Amino acid sequence: MAELYRFELKKCLQQKVLWITGGILLLCLCLWGAAACLQTTDSGLRGEEIIRLHREGGAALAGETVDQDMLDQFRPAYEKMVFAGDARELMGCIDIYEFLGHVLDTAASAEILAVDQQMLYDRLEDKLRTEAEKGSATEQAASYWQSKVQQQLSQPLVYGGYHEGWSQMASLMKVMTFLEVLFLSVALSGMFPQEAQHRTDQLILSSRRGRTALYTGKLLAGLTVGVGFGLLLLATLLGVTGLVYGLEGFGVSALFTLLMPLGASIGQVTLILFGAFLAAAAVTSLAAMVLSQVTRNSVATMGILVGILLLTTLITAVPESPRLLSVLWYLLPSNFVSLQGAFRYDLLSVGGLSLTTWQVTPVVYLLLTALLALGDWHIARG
C-alpha cells in the first residue's frame, strides 16, 4: 500500500500544470501583500504608512474601556478628517471608527459625531438582539443567542489593541477557499481520466494487488496533494500577513470585527476558519476525484467544480426559507469558509448540547470525506 501511495503521489506531483497553477495562486497572495503596502488610498496616504499609524494608535489605546472617555478621544481625530481632510490621526483609532460605523449602520459624520456611551451600548445591544432573533430558526436557538448577548454586554467592552493582521486573515478566508478549489479543479480532475486515456484501465482491473489497494493509493495521494496545498496556502497567508500587518492582537475580542456575540477572540475565530478550510480542502479533494471517476473526463470535472465556484461567488446570499435550501447552500465549502458563512445563528441540538455551525460543519466535512472515499471505491469496483 505504501509503495502504491508513493507511486501515485509522485505521478501526481510530476504534472507541470500542478506546479504552474500552484505557483500562480501563491504569487497572487504575495502580490496582495505588496499591494497593501504600496497602494495610495483616497486619503493620500500610502498603505505602509496607514499600517504604521494604525499599529501605533492601536498600541496606545490597547486595554482601554470603550466608554465616553474613549469616544471623546476619538472625536477630534474624526472631526479633523471630516472638516480638514487630514486622516492621519484617524488612522490611529480606525478600529473604533469602523466599530461605530457597524453598530450605527452608517458612515454619516453627523450621527457618528453625535454618539455617546449610552447611545452606543443601547444601539449595540439592540443590533445584537435583533440579528440573533432574525437569524435563529427556533426558539431554542433564539434563547441561546439572547443569553450570549447578555453575557457579552454584562460589562463594558475593552479594546484589546491593534489586530489588523488577524482581522485581514479572517476576512480573506473566502478568497483562500476560492484559490484552493481552483487549484483542486486543475490538479485532481485528471486523476482517473488519465487511466482511461492511457488505456491502463485493464492493468488496474487485473492487478494482483487488487483494485482496493490501487484506488486507495490514488485517493490518499489526491488527498495529500489537496490538503498539502491548503497548508501551503495558509502558511503563505500567515507569512505575508505577518510581514505586512504583523500578528499582534490575537486575544482582541472578535466583536470589533464581526458583530456577533461569539465570546471569542479574533485569533480564535481565525484558527477556527483555518481548521474549517483544511476540512473543506479534504472533502473537495475527494469530491473532485469522485467526479473524475464518474465522468472519466478531466474537462467535465473541472467545469463542474469551477461552475459551482463561480455560482457561489456570483450569488452572495439565499433566502433563509426554505431552511433546507439555506443549510445546503452554506454547506458548500466556498460559502461556509468565511466569517459570514461559518458564524451564523443556526444551532444543532445533540444530547442536550447546543452546537453551532462552526462546530458541526467541519465534522460533517470529515464524514463526507469518508463517504466519498467509500463511494469512489464502490464505483471503481463496479
Locations of regions flagged by a protein language model:
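Junction motif at the cytosolic side of a transmembrane helix
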Residues: 8-11, 291-294, 361-382
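Aromatic- and glycine-rich beta-strand/loop motifs that create alpha-glucan
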Residues: 1-21, 25
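Residue-level recognition of transmembrane alpha-helices
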Residues: 22-25, 218, 305
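Juxtamembrane non-transmembrane "cap" segments at the membrane-aqueous interface
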Residues: 244-252, 317-340
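Transmembrane helix boundary and interhelical loop/hinge segments in multi-pass membrane proteins
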Residues: 188-203, 207, 211
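Secretory targeting signals
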Residues: 28-81, 116, 120-195, 216-294, ...
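Transmembrane helix segments
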Residues: 35-36, 295-331
